[in-house]
UniProtKB/Swiss-Prot annotation:
Pfam families: BATS (PF06968), Radical_SAM (PF04055). Its cofactor is [4Fe-4S] cluster; [2Fe-2S] cluster. The keyword Nucleotide-binding does not apply. It comes from Neisseria meningitidis serogroup C (strain 053442). This is Biotin synthase. It comes from the Bacteria. One of its GO terms (biological process) is biotin biosynthetic process. Binds 1 [4Fe-4S] cluster. The cluster is coordinated with 3 cysteines and an exchangeable S-adenosyl-L-methionine.
Amino acid sequence: MTVSPVALRRKTECKPHPTARYWKKCDVEALFGLPFLELVHQAAEVHRQNFNPREIQLSTLLSIKTGGCPEDCAYCPQSAHHNTNLGKEQMMDVDEIVEKAKIAKSRGASRFCMGAAWRGPKPKDVETVSAIIKAVKGLGMETCGTFGMLEEGMAEDLKEAGLDYYNHNLDTDPDRYNDIIHTRRHEDRMDTLGKVRNAGLKVCCGGIVGMNETRAERAGLIASLANLDPQPESVPINRLVKVEGTPLDDAEDLDWTEFVRTIAVARITMPQSYVRLSAGRSNMPEAMQAMCFMAGANSIFYGDKLLTTGNPDEDGDRILMEKLNLYPLQFELEGEVAEVEKASGIKVDY
């Protein structure tokens, strides 16, 4: 794939290099600066070179331990530092979690993601979530966990329990990280990601846009993700959900075209990663979501809630996928097509 020098004419001499392994921040910003339709077109081409553009991976996300987090992330209603009227709750019962996973599978989800509002788990917490992971794996689903920063040996324990993916987002541009979070450093996130990779787990790692960042700072986030080696298997792109009581509850709305640009640039720079539409999708019109899928998004969170904030319900997602002739990615053999159609309610038409 080539990028037109004319389309990239700008004051800086920096030009994007889509085949380069290392992405400079200015290279990524140059991609953001392409004419909108040209950028989406190039991202769509990259997407089709690496994926079936009609397949969408469906994940369900459940908060198994909500509220009372000691971190002070400016975007998060679960922080104990913010007055969001979200109380601290005990961890859900294992049987209740498994029942939620069964429901998610019956509705077409292939991956069950679990989140806990911790800075990091204690050894006893790892034992508890390991039992949960084993139970969910027994249902035939992929598992993903987001439990905060890990100590030595914890990633190996989670891997042994059957965890497939570990989510640990880089949140924002490293250069502004401590404008958003003061209780940890960007380097702390990188440390846990290293532990996760060394344990043989797959990585789910993305960030949040719409936190009053500049385009250059969005480029910095994407560059930091694209330069992970190897690149994340899953890249969730969150659009800030403004919650009253958080420091960012009055953030300026991110223009929809800028969000689509972010999806497109993520696809170009991380061609073999699943790019997921994550938080904020409930406020996205169908046409905007369709543009995101065209620009390379191929995964969504499926279910009416993401941790503590709203998400489109399953019926709405089924209708949208039918309109766009998309279908769930959760099978490898043609013999499983009927089972997928029955579970999701979505007609699979090759």
